Amino acid sequence: MKFPNAQATVYNDTVVRQFAIMTVVWGVVGMLVGVIIAAQLAWPELNLGISFLSYGRLRPLHTNAVIFAFGGCGLFATAYYVVQRTCQVRLFSDKLAAFTFWGWQLVILAAALSLPLGYTQGKEYAELEWPIDILITLVWVSFA
């Protein structure tokens, strides 16, 4: 039932759209790296003798890109879309939502640069160095 004087809520779909687009972009990048390392299993010479193109350096990049970049962006997009509509309110702060978007993209970019260069903690699914971990914490706390 609609009330005659009720105003329609205007949602912040900008951040939802940004995260949705980057979900596709990072999904393609992550899957492409996966195809490259799968091909390297059959043809090891595909790394061209370049250390940052080796299987051992690209595999952490692939797993982190698919889990954190693709999965994380999809999670943020879904959460920002669903919460606004189920609660029927706009996001608390557009600037905070923008920070989560740009902060998360910075996390992904830092991971994409550091992992092939070999800067890791050497722990499966927790390879990222501590400065990136701090940025991840800041983004997730601001999201909460």
Regions found by a protein language model. Give the residues of each.
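Hydrophobic cores of alpha-helical transmembrane segments in multi-pass integral membrane proteins
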Residues: 17-119, 130-144
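Intrinsic disorder/low-complexity signature
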Residues: 2, 9-10, 59, 91
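Juxtamembrane interface elements at the cytosolic ends of transmembrane helices
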Residues: 1-5, 141-144
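A generic structural signal for ordered alpha-helices
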Residues: 6-10, 53, 122
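Cytosolic juxtamembrane amphipathic/interface segments immediately preceding
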Residues: 4-18
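Membrane-helix interface and helix-disruption motif detector
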Residues: 123-129
